[in-house]
C-alpha cells in the first residue's frame, strides 16, 4: 500500500432538522393545543486513531465528508431522528490542523483516541415550546442550525523511540532488519528506502522499544536534493537519534564528510531536532580489513571531533548490534523513569516537544512551498526553451507564394 503522510480534506456536519407547527386533533378533544415536535440533531464528524491503519492514502482520493442531516420533527410531540455520526479512521500519530487558522484541533497518539472535528447542527424547536397563557395556539417553529464546515489537514508522524539517520545506502535498513522483525527492502543502490519503516526491537523479555527507519539524506536535502527533507518530520517524536555511518562508502566518499553533511542538513531543517541525543554507529566494519579497522574508525571520530556515545557494527553480519540495542533500551528507560519521578523535567520535555512539533511543521510547510516554486520555475524555463526552438528571424528557407488571377 502506498505510504501517504499528509492529506487535506473538508468535513461538513449535518444540519439540524426543522421543528414543526402542529396541533393535536382528536375526536372529542376540542382545542387540543400545539403538539409540534423538535427537529433531530445533525450528525457530527469524528476522527479516530486506529492501530490497523498505517497510511492516509484513502484521504488522497476521497476528500469530502458530510454527515447526515437530522430529520424534521412531527406531530404528537415526535422529535426527529438525529443524523448518523461519521467516524474517519487515521493512523496513530496523526495531527489534525485547521487550515484556515493553523490551530491544532487534536493530536491522536493512542489507539481509539477520538476528536470531534465538525459539530452537528442543533434541531429546530416545534411550536410546543412557544405556547403561553396569552398564546395558546402558536404557529411559530424554528429551523435547525447549520452543521459546522471545516477544511483540515491531516499530518502523520510515526511514533518511535529511536530514529535512524544517515546517508542513502549507509545500512539503515539492514540494521533495523538485524535488530527487529521489520523487513524493509534492502539493495546495493541508494534510496532503496522510499518511505518510513517501523520495527519493534526486543532487548529482553518485556523490554522493547520502537525504531523508525526513514529514507536517507544527502547534502543539499534542505534545498530539495534527493528526497529532500520531507521525511525528517518523522523524527520529531523520537527520543534518540541513531546516526548510521558507512565507514567504507561504495562511491569512495569520505565518511566524516558525509556525517558532517547529515548534521548540517538536520540543523538547517530544525535546530531543535538537532538537539536530540545522538548515538553514532560506525557501520559496515566487514568492508574493512580487520587489522586496520580501529585506526580507520578512530580517524573518522577525530575528523568529527566526536565525544558522544559510539558503537562499531556490521549490520550484515549482526556484529555489535546487541550492544547498541541494550544501550538504547537503558537510555529510554532512564528517560521514562525520570519523567515520572521529576515533574519539572517532565514539563521541560513537554515544552521541548511542543517547540519541536511547531518547528518541524513550519519547516515542512516552508520546504513544500519552496519545492513547488522551484518546480514552477523549471516548467517555465522548459516552456521558454521550447519557444526558442522556433526562430522566426531566419527566413532562408521561406517560400513566398504569389497568386495571380487570370
From Swiss-Prot:
Binding positions (GTP): 166-173, 191-195, 213-216, 283-286, 314-316
Pfam family, one: GTP1_OBG
Annotated spans, Disordered: 120-143, 381-406
Name this protein carries in UniProt: GTPase Obg
Assigned EC number: 3.6.5.-
Family: Belongs to the TRAFAC class OBG-HflX-like GTPase superfamily. OBG GTPase family.
Gene Ontology cellular-component annotations: cytoplasm
Any one GO molecular function term: magnesium ion binding
Cofactor(s) essential for the protein: Mg(2+)
Source organism phylogeny: Bacteria, Pseudomonadati, Pseudomonadota, Gammaproteobacteria, Moraxellales
Gene Ontology biological process terms in this record: ribosome biogenesis
UniProt-annotated location(s): Cytoplasm
Binding site for Mg(2+): 173, 193
Assembly, per entry: Monomer.
Residue intervals of the Obg domain: 1-159
Segments of skewed composition (Acidic residues): 383-399
Coiled-coil residues: none
Role description: An essential GTPase which binds GTP, GDP and possibly (p)ppGpp with moderate affinity, with high nucleotide exchange rates and a fairly low GTP hydrolysis rate. Plays a role in control of the cell cycle, stress response, ribosome biogenesis and in those bacteria that undergo differentiation, in morphogenesis control.
SUPFAM superfamilies: Obg GTP-binding protein N-terminal domain (SSF82051), P-loop containing nucleoside triphosphate hydrolases (SSF52540)
Every OBG-type G domain range: 160-333
Entry keyword set: Cytoplasm, GTP-binding, Hydrolase, Magnesium, Metal-binding, Nucleotide-binding
